[in-house]
Amino acid sequence: MTDVTVKSLAAEIQTPVDRLVQQFADAGIKKSDVDSVTQQEKEILLAHLNREHGSVPNKLTLQRKTRSTLNIPSTGGKSKSVQIEVRKKRTYVNTPEAEQAKAEEQAQREAEATAQKIAEEKAKREAEEQAKREAAEKAKRQAAEKEKVTNQQTDEKTKPAQTDKARREAEAAELKRSVEEETRRKVEEDAKRVAEEARKMAAENEGKWPEPVAEQTESADYHVTTSQHARAAEDENDAKVEGDRRSRTRGGKATKQKKGNKLSESKADREEARAVGRKGKRKPSTLQQSFNKPVVAVNRDVVIGETVTVAELANKMAVKGSQVIKAMMKLGAMATINQVIDQETAQLVAEEMGHKVILRRENELEEALMSDRDIGVEAAAEHRAPVVTIMGHVDHGKTSLLDYIRSTKVASGEAGGITQHIGAYHVETENGMITFLDTPGHAAFTSMRARGAQATDIVVLVVAADDGVMPQTIEAIQHAKAANVPVVVAVNKIDKPEADPDRVKTELSQYGIQPEEWGGESQFINVSAKAGIGIDELLNAILLQAEVLELKAVRTGMANGVVIESFLDKGRGPVATVLVQQGTLNKGDIVLCGFEYGRVRAMRDELGRDITSVGPSIPVEILGLSSVPAAGDEVTVVRDEKKAREVALYRQGKFREVKLARQQKSKLENMFANMTEGEVSELNIVIKSDVQGSCEAICDSLEKLSTDEVKVRIVGSGVGGITETDATLAAASGAIILGFNVRADASARRVVETEGLDLRYYSVIYSLIDEVKQAMSGMLAPEYKQQIIGLAEVRDVFKSPKFGAIAGCMVTEGVIKRNNPIRVLRDNVVIYEGELESLRRFKDDVSEVRNGMECGIGVKNYNDVRTGDVIEVFEIIEIKRTIA
């Protein structure tokens, strides 16, 4: 036989050549695609594959459908026909044991057939030999008898003739021929009879021998009976069920039958009947076998996100929601079916119910989007300009100092002369470029100062030499320490006569800011923003500190940064001031910024000039975002705008879910506070501001004004002008509208006039907070104080038919007025509190009696007045309360 190559063998068995070569290698035979393969190597490969994969058991699936029609009687004496289709399916598996048994049975049948054939041939030969012997013996007997007769005739006739002798010879030959034919015919008939009997016996054996084989094959399967027996049993059962049904529908009592049927019902049927109730109808007969398939608990792979409702968790496990709630109650957690639970709780519940939990990270898309960025890893990091944040107390000269550095008039443009935004500027000096962030110093702008400290490299702490350390100065120190950034102290207003730089050093040393000359690490520079003293020294100190820090950044690759400030411009849309920290931001880049996304349509520097690209440590205004981002959000340049949109929408939904979950969460310790919440007055406010940072600062400041009696509720807040939507929201919620550096449009003013809303404009945050305090003070419940205005001593008691007991009194102090509340004191103990009903002097009714005069006093509904009692007259005074 010619050897075949590996390539031709692969084509013959329809498998790739590489895979066949690998299989030969796994079997210990090294082959290439052009090598030949012998029969022995084929057998080695086949044995290896059988060991590796095993032989697949042969399966045989039989399906059978039987259709029948049943006439079921119904109400009204009519019967209806119901088509019934019974589907049955059996699978027979040909296991190796069954194959071996079948082979043994086949060998046994072949051996028996061979033995039978040998027995038939032997019987045939014996029958033929017996027939020949019998025929020979018969012929001999006939010949002997004939010879005997012939001898007798010869003896009787001593003279036979020659003709008689010839005739006798002819008769003897004829007799011999007839005997031989008779013998041959009998032998053939006997052989045919024996062969027919052998065929009948073989046919009977073939009908008898397969029965035990079939029974063994059926018993090897998981079915109890053969298909014929099962069909007979099913037909018998169907006939029995139909007979029972007809016996029930005939109208007879059949109490024993009903009782037997009730006993034969399964537990599940009884529970279902109990769940339906007594009013439900009797469950109709299902006309099926009473065998119920055993139920096995299915363990599923449950995929759980960061949050999931109880109903969703039940659907994932394919169970009822009540079962999940029961499992949670066993674990000590109470929940409703629509309540949102966290990932850990859902994992505990699912594992308790026997399922496998797969925790899903819902921010996989975000991680994939962030990983697919060109961040310029191969490029070397270069030196970058330091980001310097100017911090300090309000009115200590931060903006004026920066104004002198930039040689512009920024401070004069701020309302009230105080900074209310974060200003981002970069300036070119002789020694390099510096980026400045100017933060507000007012107490309301805590979060804005914290944002400035997080995005900065160096903090310049401005302290007035004549004012010293103030509350916002301490807060700025805390922000700088929290951000772990070095501090350069600028002692401002050094040109004033009352300036005391040493006092500033002493006060700052108490908060961990030690001067270099005292052994510390902070540089103290004496400056004057008005006179320009020490400005160059301050810049050199900043650059020296930056050189020590060795600030570096990668200029190539996709940019990322932070939002310093954001606002809504009427003509340009959402505008965000971004400080680039890594990479290069180009016009047309796709950016993901917190909850917002977009393509950079335009970029402008702090002077309003259009630019196309910007590197690290440079602030820039970008246009093109989907909405106004929150200040402090991280800005990242990505590749795919569609994925950026999906990530932004996911973040918005996640923020909304967390917010709702936080609102729904009710703790036991807040129960009493929630019960008394209805007694608290609420001041609803709608706030619109020019920039996001100011809006956030105002909301925080107003919410801190809330007390136990008056609560400030921010109904709506946003960036941009006051629109008709804002006015409608304020009208629906009964809120006042506060505009900070923004104005209302015509449609909003029309709604304000129609609804009579309170609309106020502000440009300084001081005024806004003070007026909100006044509005809250007007909502406070007034305080009432009791002020004693007179005392009268009872000298005698008279009886009056109209008023009862009348006390004759002497006014010892103050004034006694009629219809005022009084107290009756006996031994300095209040025994009665009521109202002065009658006041007379010399039988005349008077409205008041002054000190040192006598009078008669009638107390309403009180007659137990005695001599020596003291009547105290007082009045209730309302005291107006204010918010501290």
Curated annotation (Swiss-Prot):
InterPro entries, alphabetized: DNA-bd_dom_put_sf, EF-G-like_DII, EFTu-like_2, IF2_assoc_dom_bac, IF2_II, IF2_N, P-loop_NTPase, Small_GTP-bd
Region (G2), start-end ranges: 417-421
User: Which Pfam family, any one of them, does this sequence belong to?
Assistant: GTP_EFTU_D2
Query: What keywords are assigned to this protein?
Result: Cytoplasm, GTP-binding, Initiation factor, Nucleotide-binding, Protein biosynthesis
Basic residues composition bias: residue spans: 247-261
Q: Where is this region: G5?
A: 528-530
Which Gene Ontology terms of cellular component type are present? Answer: cytosol
- Basic and acidic residues bias spans: 99-209, 231-246, 262-275
Q: Where is this region: G4?
A: 492-495
Q: What is this protein called?
A: Translation initiation factor IF-2
Localisation: Cytoplasm
Q: Where is this region: G1?
A: 392-399
